[in-house]
């Protein structure tokens, strides 16, 4: 990974993702898109530095940057943030190993991060790249978020 790149980033317009090249593209695309998804390797110093430059409260940044194994989301006035439990993306592993995905979601920016590869991120990324994700709400199967319907 280069010094100025997330693991990957997409800008979404009309429900379709367009891959972004680096942090500068992610920062610059804000007003021209519906939302931006940036996925970080939180073990990288560059990713941590980019995360700390976000205009979010310090406690939000510290929570998502921390290497913790907590499965909990918090709702603030203009964002949802925290950690989701997931499984490591290790195709040759005999057993499933737990992992943690950090999340910060606002209306225009979704930031996810991990220290190890995770299955759900790999699956969503492959669907975005294949243009198969439909522009509809994603069901939260973790039992943490649920709709009122």
Where are these regions (language model features)?
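Peripheral, non-transmembrane regulatory/ligand-interaction domains of membrane transport proteins
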Residues: 1-149
